[in-house]
């Protein structure tokens, strides 16, 4: 059996390497666990990209543009649905509909929306699109070539994720 010299340079630096590794893992875990109200930009952009793909497959020739007003309307409704457990669709806790919220956000065109509610902390854009794709009413909204603008927002808590997409036809 060979005995290792605990004072050799390779073993003296081991504890600092181990501590650095553990510290990095701990820091990574803290960075990954973003606050519930964080801007889920990558998720939202993924939804926009996937809706654009569906529109393209439906034969739509215009590019989908992100509208700040529609994004704001989507944000308001996503927060409302997240914080009011009895909501799971288009009507807000104040009785507002998607057109009301879009108008309040400064959008004057015709709008529709799709809403996804998931009973977990995390949701991804493919789960959202799959949910909407297989609902005939939502698929019709996503593939409607007249809807040339979009705003997407998602929010999550420890036990609920909500994603809202508001689609617009400019006035």
Residue spans for each PLM region:
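Generic alpha-helix initiation/capping and coil-helix boundary signal
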Residues: 14-17, 21-22, 67, 71, ...
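Short amphipathic alpha-helical segments with coiled-coil-like heptad repeat character
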Residues: 3, 82-83, 142
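Short, charge-rich amphipathic segments
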Residues: 9, 58-73, 142, 165-171
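Polybasic, low-complexity, intrinsically disordered segments
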Residues: 37, 42-45, 140, 171
């Amino acid at each position: 059996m060979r005995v290792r010299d605990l004072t050799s340079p390779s073993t003296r630096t081991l504890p600092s390497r181990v501590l650095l590794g553990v510290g990095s893992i701990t820091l990574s875990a803290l960075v990954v666990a973003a606050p519930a109200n964080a801007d889920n930009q990558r998720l939202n952009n993924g939804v926009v990209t996937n809706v654009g793909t569906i529109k393209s497959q439906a034969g739509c020739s215009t590019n989908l543009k992100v509208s700040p007003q529609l994004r704001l309307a989507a944000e308001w409704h996503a927060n409302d649905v997240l914080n009011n457990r009895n909501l799971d669709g288009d009507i807000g806790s104040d009785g507002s509909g998607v057109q009301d919220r879009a108008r309040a956000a400064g959008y004057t065109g015709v709008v529709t929306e799709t809403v996804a509610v998931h009973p977990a902390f995390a949701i991804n854009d493919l789960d959202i699109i799959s949910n909407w794709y297989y609902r005939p009413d939502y698929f019709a909204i996503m593939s409607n070539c007249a809807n040339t603008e979009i705003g997407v927002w998602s929010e999550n808590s420890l036990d609920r994720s909500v994603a809202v997409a508001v689609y617009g036809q400019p006035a």
